[in-house]
Each structure stands twice: as structure tokens, then as C-alpha cells.
Amino acid sequence: MTVPKPLKKAFTVGTAAVAAALLSLPIAVPAGAEPAPAPAVGSTQWIVVGVPAASATSGTLTAFQRVGQQWKTVLGPIKAMVGDVGVGEGADGVHRTPVGTFAFDQAFGREPNPGTAMPYFQATTADWWDQDAGSPTYNTHVQSAANPSSVTENLYDSGPVYDYAVNIAVNPQRIPGKVSGIFLHVTDGTPTWGCVAIGRSEMKSLLTWLDPSANPRITIGVGDPALLPAQS
């Protein structure tokens, strides 16, 4: 497993210290959004995205690796772009990044697999993400020579932002209309349609670091930082 080179000196804190720090932080949850819980027991990789206000379109991303009872910073904090109407409760057709703690499932990119252990496919013009709430393949990856439904995103034609990406499993139950196609991907320097976006080299490093056996999670919230790992 490759750990990305930290962009600044890494720090290590014990679980108790992190929990105490968490309680002292000015954490806010946007109206209509559920508080972001800690990752499931067994997670040893955690990505935290924090924004200064629910209406903010950028914030920071920090990646943590759990070693024993300690969390170590392995990347960040780095700049991260979020939805062009900020963060809060997600919904199809609303460019808002969902708040909460979520798993990662499917990685992909226009570029070859950079060495990630996550399930990965190299996107072509035949790769789509179905966002049609009335489709039987809603909120899934679809391979088709032609557009498979009325509301889709072509994962190749969308351009360099999808050179490297991973799906944030915000709506794994695929509840129609709840939210679909929320990814962590490469930034083009502008706010997103609801995804989280970071620099290309950092995105590539994160993919090589992510390991499904570590039960990786991402937490998105409001605060400075939004949340810190406080898992016992």
C-alpha cells in the first residue's frame, strides 16, 4: 500500500486527544442535513473535507491513516472545491455537496489505473453514469455505445476532471431522486456540481493510497476543520 507524501509535516494524535479537540470545535450542520457520524468501526483510512460555511464553495481536504490508536495525517490539508451552492442536503439537480460520512466504492479515470487497490476502470466514450431517477440503472456505471438514458454523464467526454476519480457512495440504496453521481475527482479550479474536487497530483496520490481493506470513509461538513477522527 502506497502512502502519499504529506504536503506539510505530519502530526500524530491519540484518540482521546482527538475526541477532546472535536468537542471544542465550532461544528455546524446545515439545515436539513444529518450530523456527520464517525466512520464505521474498522475504518483505518479517513478523508475529512471541511468548509467554513454551508454556502462556501471551497474548503480543505485532509487524509488520515489510523495506526493502532493514533491517526496520522498522510495528505493535506489541501484546497478542495465543493458544490457551487455549497454543502448540505444533497438532491438530484441541485449543485450541493452532501454532508455526512460516506464510503467509497468504484474508482475510475480517463487515465490508466495509477496503482490503486480500489476497483478501477479506465473510462472511454462508452462509459456513463446514469442519473435518470426513472432508469433501472439509476446511480450506477453503465457501458453503452449510445447514451443509455435521458439524464447521464459521459465519464470520458466530461474531460480532464475525470482523469482520476472515485465514487462517493452517498446513495448506495439508489433511492430515485435522492442524489447520484457524487465523486471525488480532479479540479478544474471552479466549484463543482456537487462533487469534491482537488488537484490532479493529489487525486492520483489518494487513489494509490486508498485500500478497500481499510474500509475508507470520507466525512464532509461545516467547520474548521469540519470534523476530526474521533474513533476509538
Residue positions per predicted region:
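Cell wall/extracellular polymer interaction/catalysis modules
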Residues: 34-192, 203-216, 223-232
